[in-house]
């Protein structure tokens, strides 16, 4: 307690966060010293580790100011007493580090990636506006089925296909783009096929013609998908729609009928979240291994891109080991699957807490997904699927031609305006950049020039204020600038906390 009081005397310490397993120790401290004002202002925060759940970790690591200073995170032991709980401390540290990483990744780290998404979104706009809207989907199909089965392409999928075929009429079947050709091969018709990747390789899952099989399937595409995806679907007159996630450029266009829902990092996450919004009570996962099979396979044997994953098992071995399904030892995972799994675990916790949805992991293999109920697929079929659904589901209609033309014209105008915003922004800040760069070059040759240092800092602050104003007023720029500014601020925090002791230290800072 005395240590906390001393640390809190330093005005630079905005918050002190204490993780404590034995909360009685904290109560004793509160009886001895008065921390009422520090607790009320949240300068002192006490979290009992045994009561922390996935959602709390995620919210903590993505909130201000903790996220902004995530690159200088460290977990400090208060005394040697806590060394006896080293396993608990290491586990806590592991969770915090992972959640900070996930939060950073969720903000993006590449402006070029953001630009690719915007470019493909603009290219897809005519297809989105002239096809059925997300609003139409929700109005006609929400709540018509209790149980959703989400089909992914993990190594365990093959053994589940016979049961899936037998019970397909009794559940809503959502499948990943990569699972679609596999289900077609086994004549198992999904109700929804989802796709969200931006790359042309993923579009190739639709470069086929399954004829009558495709009738009544709805292909739901994230509005960022590669244009080849819609080209292949149009070629065979398949039913598709484009749906938007929450993003500043998309929101700027105000095409609200065609969104919005968060789609996560993978098509399996997207399937899961759409199943939530369509008001299913139970969600069953199959083929969701998120780990390599014992023989090193990354996907089911029918997966068309197996050759693209050769050598990955050897590359990842012993780097991303995690708990196995059914608590059967450990399995080998990958960086991307670990990210997907953590994203899934957050979604599962959210679905249970806020939507009262039960998630069953019936993969019977792969990695454990915390928060799911692990059951054999046969159990789920026999206990959750009792009657045939009224399939095919109600047909979706596009907007009227007049409404389509109205949205197309408004979107064109907004895109044109955004291009102008970007050009104005570029021209203005290139001049400011050149000025600061020239000043900085002069500074390197004159370390004693404190006046010049102050002038440079003043110019930088002025530009930062201007960027902040644009960031808050021109929402279309946010999506492009967001990843760059976030990474810049995270790195700047490392410099911000430095405490210069000499003039040279101040100069370097």
Predicted segment positions?
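Extended, hydrophobic alpha-helical segments in both membrane/secreted and soluble proteins
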Residues: 173-179, 219, 268-271, 287
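Active-site/ligand-binding-proximal alpha/beta "capping" segment
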Residues: 227-290
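Glycine-rich phosphate/pyrophosphate-binding loops
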Residues: 20, 179-180, 187-197, 275-301
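Phosphate-binding loop/pocket of nucleotide- and phosphate-handling active sites
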Residues: 297-347
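N-terminal donor/sugar-recognition subdomains of glycan-related enzymes
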Residues: 2-148, 155-172, 181-185, 192, ...
